[in-house]
Amino acid sequence: MVERTQIINAVTAAITQAPERKFQESIDITINLKHVDMAQPKNRIDETILLPQAIGVKKIAVLGKGDIVSQARNAGVDLIIGPDEIERLGGVPREARKMAGQYDFFLAETAVMPLVGRWLGQRLGPRGKMPQPIPPTQDITPIVERLRNSVKIRSKDRLNMSVKVGNTGMTVEEVSENIDAVVKRVVGRLESGELNIRSVYVKTTMGPAVKVM
């Protein structure tokens, strides 16, 4: 497994080599795989990872009616969509696509999942954003709190994937801790573990890519 010092050195280099900007830049990593058959769906990476260091609040939408709506309001979610609105959005593809792009995570009570699949599945599914089903008695507050500080990493059918792990307003150690968490999670999903990792790079929005491993 990659040593933390390697990660710290790479993050430091990525930040120092980047052109100076007057705005805060994102810091992303790209993980390149090898010897993985991505034609097999079981080998594809699709993980939601809770980061040890927060990188900015994620936007969360809740779909449903009744008790989950009051829970969603109390949890401070960014958007609540009722059954009628689900159906309406399904008839306005452009608006549905915009909504799918604006929000990071979706939760839906189990009762409306068939509606979601019918009307919004084409917009959410390809983005890996189909809602997490919520049973009637489940408290969504801890789920919302966890997702606020989580990222989603997906390979689809490719041998590479990228994800945001921080920003230039964070310390090198904080960003490095997040990178460590993401890499370990991906390695844990691979059949041959670290042997399936070709390389990992880190970069700021406008800066050059620096090799981590």
Curated annotation (Swiss-Prot):
Keywords, comma-separated and alphabetical: Repressor, Ribonucleoprotein, Ribosomal protein, RNA-binding, rRNA-binding, Translation regulation, tRNA-binding
Q: Which GO terms describe its biological process?
A: regulation of translation; translation
Q: Which InterPro entries match?
A: Ribosomal_uL1 (IPR002143), Ribosomal_uL1-like (IPR023674), Ribosomal_uL1/biogenesis (IPR028364), Ribosomal_uL1_3-a/b-sand (IPR016095), Ribosomal_uL1_arc (IPR023669), Ribosomal_uL1_CS (IPR023673)
* Entry annotated with the keyword Zinc-finger: no
Q: Name one GO cellular component term.
A: large ribosomal subunit
Q: Which PROSITE patterns match?
A: RIBOSOMAL_L1
Question: Which Pfam family, an example, fits this chain?
Answer: Ribosomal_L1
GO molecular function terms noted in the UniProt entry: rRNA binding; structural constituent of ribosome; tRNA binding
The UniProt family comment states: Belongs to the universal ribosomal protein uL1 family.
What does the subunit section of this Swiss-Prot or TrEMBL entry state? Answer: Part of the 50S ribosomal subunit.
* Function recorded in the entry: Binds directly to 23S rRNA. Probably involved in E site tRNA release. Protein L1 is also a translational repressor protein, it controls the translation of its operon by binding to its mRNA.
Could you tell me what this protein is called?
Answer: Large ribosomal subunit protein uL1
